[in-house]
Amino acid sequence: MKHTPLTFLLLILASSFAFCQEPTPKGHPLTLTGYGFYDTHYASGSLGGGALMLDWQAAPAFCLGIGAEYASSNRISARLTGQATILTTLLQQRLTLENSYLWRHFPALNLQEFTGALQIGWYARHLNLHLGLCNRYIAELVQRNNGGQGTVFEPMNVMFAIEGWWHNSLVPNQWNIGLRWSNYNDFIIERVANWFFSAKALYSLPDSTRLYAEAGIHPVGSLNLTASYDGWFLHLGAVKPL
């Protein structure tokens, strides 16, 4: 616990960088992403909700993003992300450095979760790789018998994501399909042994809007307490350059 402030300070100093899934088209510095989702598993039933994210391409190699999610009285989430492209090859492959901060609130449990993460990413023609570390606080726990409140700190959890795409993901395609294996998504970071497996699909409209869908399985339970794969989720949304 005594090293916690220093750890988060290092994350902040190492950041000022943001993360965008794909470069924003020229002339469109802002990109709005919205999706609805349905999530169900045996342990906690079903829930629905939606999310909005806004990305700002502040410079050719720098992007800043904000986002919020609401999940039918189960959780409310917000995040701030930042990414810099630190290397671009002749084939347009990119090496990025990403910093993100995630806040989640669970009203029924009176819990709040704060997570800071730092990642590197590699974007190639058909494969995207991400690897990083995060620190997590879980605060405002249920009062103990002595009337006090506690805080749980989880240092240095590993984050990873591997995505494979049918078409070259570095250039525009009318459609694309892919597979993803990771322990996190936009507003959830699981422990490294709790994995998400999903299939993704993208379709581009003439006005540069992209429709997308993602369906997969994921660990069940709340706050990373179990890892049995009997749950599934569905995301449906669109990405619109502004």
Describe the function of each predicted region.
Residues 44-50, 74-80, 110-116, 125, ...:
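Residues that define the transmembrane beta-barrel architecture of outer-membrane proteins
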Residues 34-42, 68-74, 86-88, 101-107, ...:
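Transmembrane beta-strands of outer-membrane beta-barrel pores
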Residues 115-186:
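Detector for outer-membrane/organellar transmembrane beta-barrel domains
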Residues 191-242:
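Predominantly the C-terminal beta-signal and adjacent terminal strand-loop region
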Residues 53, 81-87, 117-121, 161-165, ...:
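Outer-membrane beta-barrel architecture
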Residues 1-29, 242:
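Cleavable N-terminal export/targeting peptides
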Residues 20-73, 239-241:
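Short glycine/proline- and aromatic-enriched beta-strand/turn motifs that initiate or cap beta-hairpins
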Residues 30-32, 60-66, 89-97, 125-131, ...:
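Repeated loop/turn-to-beta-strand initiation elements of outer-membrane beta-barrel proteins
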